[in-house]
Structure formats: C-alpha cells, structure tokens
Amino acid sequence: MNYDKKTIRDIDVSGKKILLRCDFNVPHDKATGVIHDDTRIVSTLPTIRYLLDHNAAVILLSHMGRPHGEWKKELSLFSARDHLEELLEMPVPLTEDVLGPDTKAKCAALQPGQVVLVENLRFRLEEEKNDPEFAKELASLADIFVFDAFGAAHRAHASTEGVSHYLPSVAGLLVEKELEFMGKALDDPKRPLVAILGGSKVSDKIGVINNLLQKADTILIGGGMAYTFQAALGRDIGTSLLDANHVGYAKDMIAKAQEMGVKLLLPQDNLAAKEFSADADPILVDAAAFPHDLMGMDIGPKTIEDFTGAIAGAGTVIWNGPMGVFEFPAFANGTNAVAKAMADQKDAVTIVGGGDSSSAVEKSGFADKLSHISTGVGASLEFLEGLVLPGIACLADKD
C-alpha cells in the first residue's frame, strides 16, 4: 500500500465545502455524556483549524459506538459537539438527523469559516454496509472529501471508503502524521528496529508477528502472550494465560526468528500471583522454573533489564501491547519501565501502536516524550500486519 497520499496541504480548499471524516468515537458516560478521554477529538483539531483558516466550510462526520441502525440517545454525538464548541470556541451545530431534511438544510446553508457536525452515521444501517447510494448522498453535501479518522481506516464503510468514489479525496493532518510515522517505521526505519509486543493472546497478533519477522531486528515479547511462547519451549507456566491453540505457531515463530537472524527475547523472570487481583502479593519467579500454582502478572527485573537494554540500542521502537496487568499498580512495573526506556531514547523514533499500550503510556506519564502515539486500535494492528487499509487506499496518491 502506498503511504504517500495527497493531503489538505496539496489542494485549494478556499471557498469549498469539505466532508471531513473524523473519529469522535470517544469513551464517555452514557447517562451524562461526560467524555472520559478526548484524545481522538483533540487529535483532529489541527485539520479542522487548517480548513477554517483557509476559508473552507467544514462538514464533520463520525460514528459513535454500535447502534446497529437504531437511534440511541446515549450514542448521540451531542457530547462530542459540546466539547468541540469549547475547544474551537465557536458554535458547532449538530444535525437532528442523518442525511434527512435537517442535515441537508444545515449543510446547504453552511458558509466558509463555519462548521456543522452530522449526527452519528451508524444510526443508519447503510453506513456500515458501505451502501453506494448512501455514500453518493453523503458526497453530494460537499466538494472535497478529507479522511482524518485513522481509528476507522480499516473499515470499508460509506463514510470512510464509499464517498471517495464520488469526490476528490485526500488525507487530513492526523492521518498524514500516522502514515509518516507508522509507514516509515515499517518500510524505511532508522535501524536497529526493535518491536515490542504484549497483550493477552497470540491469536490477536499472528499477522503482526509474521510481518515484523520480515522487518524487525529484535522482537521483545511480554504480556499474557509470552506464556504461550514459554509453553512452546516446553516450560511450565503454572495457571498463567495460555493460548493453547497457538503453542505450535509460537514454536514455529521461535524457530523462524532464529533462521532469519531476528533476535527474539522472551521473559527470563516474572512477577506472579496466586490470584488475579489488584490486592494479590507479587511473587518473583524464574521463567524456567514456574510454580504450578501461580499465574504470571508482569515481567520481572531481569527481563526489564534485557528489554530496556534492547530499547536503549534502538534506532526505531514500535510498541503494541502492555507487559503485564498494568491496571494493577503492583504489576505495572514492566509496562512503565518500557515506557520510560522509550522516553529516554531521545535520538530514536518511538511509536506506540494504539489500544492498551496507548492507555498504559498515558498512565505512565511519558506520553509527551515519545515520537508518536497512534490513535488507532484495530487500524494500528492491521497496519502493523501490513494489510491494506480501505480508508487510506482510497485517497489520492501524491504526484
């Protein structure tokens, strides 16, 4: 997939109506509408402001949750609208329907320098079905389509891919940044390239591991998925998380890494516990002599030393997935140590690939010291797998 896409900087937007696909699918209190994390809204502000500063009229599109074509008040975009008005310090009208009379009237009346937000697109079933007529109707509202919803880039929906068949289509500034960092890290990285993989299941990361084995110099494996790799070495893992269907795959990957000259580091030691609880006492165990009645909860100090040492020598670091149960303070050391080691690498390109690892970095306090934190979850994973993302592939390539 070509990552060198045209952006809003490459076209004239003055006096034009812009259909801007954002990702305002933010965690919020369904009763009060209070937003818990506004990262996705804040991340697209540079694009909105650029368009307004260049005399464009901006029609914002987004989804929220999974209403399955039903109108659900708790999944309305009113909370995102209210927050946007505060951030932009200007009115942001919210349409009362999706492509009904109110949407069409508000968009028709929109002037350069003004913004309107269309209500949750998933209130219409046609959105997720990528219905061509629905996409065509959306496109009829504007002159240009701008895609800035990286978190939805892996979805071929009417507002992410469908509209591109009817309008000139370019990337927003957030998507430009995602492609610049994630694309270069995979295709032309500053070496050595160190990939850190964590999280629960091996099955969730099969495509990522397969792709990174072709590209990385070193792969560090922690989190719940590491116990499946330990089991592949014939080790006892006690009551730790085991992806039993993928022990054979893990064994093959260990052999393949060796064959390809990729350094694959697994935990030497772990912090374990008798039960999965925030109050459980951490017990340090050797990975090669794991007690049968304990479960692994985090990587241990020797492993932290190994992993941070590998990060210290890196030119590029990509991280996806926590090293342990970071939500429990007693088992957050490994995750925090990785975040700190990345933050300390001033000369390296340091990228966090969305999801739990992004939350962990924010919680660790090192987020502002890293090169890039992806706003995608599923999109970031599919990007790391080397898959084609429909929301990106449909955008115009640079000349």
Predicted ranges, named:
Residues 1-399:
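Active-site loop-to-helix "anion-binding N-cap" substructures in soluble metabolic enzymes
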